[in-house]
Amino acid sequence: MADSPLVFPSVEAQRLEPHLPDLSTGTKNDVSSSSSLPFVTLTFATSLDSALSLGPGIRTALSGPQSKAMTHYLRSRHDAICVGVGTAIADDPGLNCRLAADSTPQASSHAAATAGVGALLGLASVSTDNAMIGETSSGITARQPRPIVIDPRLRWDFTPKSKVMQLARAGKGLAPYVITAVPQPPESKRKLLEDAGGKFIVLNEPKSSDTRMDLSSRRFDWHSILNAVRNEGLQSIMVEGGGEVINSLLSGENSQFIDSVIITLAPTWLGQGSVFISPPRKTSPDGKPSAVARLTNTTWIPLGEDVVLCGKIAS
């Protein structure tokens, strides 16, 4: 928890702007959009062979210092960040923003709606239920995203010592919302979450006949997840991982929910046995294989030894 604040240059932040939710509203930049779902950014770091880590449960550092700072800048620009239960168990992540106060964006979607022009101009410290702008004594920005953990069967045995809970108590992050299919989570876990400002969000588990669901891993359907997030007043969400979550979001019709893709490419190969980003291949009506998805409106941004690829899923 002694991690120092990070700084992300404004010139690089400006290059990312076309790929992010609107700064003042947190919603989709396309004013013609009538979607009631949050703005969804899919972002992750990958090796040259499209691997996230050396193996299941193995924490693998891929991002260099510049692209790591970029990730925290992206967190500051979203109302929520989302990971799967596997990542929560394997990494014990903090799921907060460590951007230095002078690198904080001037507005957030929630702050803009509640604090008006003063917040937009950065003239006041703003605190809301879902997002905050200002500075703490640590020098780390108080504008924090809400962690969302997808945990259908409550496999994540979080405790007061879990990093995300410690950061929430210290005022350096927010407590998570845990999306689960368990109708009555344990009272001790519920109290622990709620005392820190988090909670359980209970969704009905899709039936095996639900075509929107990846049957091999029994996931929730993404429309239900994103609708639940939006119902909490969160207008933008950054999906960070892990592999099952990313592959699921890229699969089939799920990719229609993605508004922006931001991928950090690290100059390394992880090799066989790694956790790869490789969603199920599509098949054309005549039975021939076809590509799952392609990016359009792409931007390439060198950051140190890494390269960041930004784009939008082609329709």
State where each predicted segment sits:
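Enzymes that bind and transform nitrogen-containing heteroaromatic metabolites
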Residues: 1-315
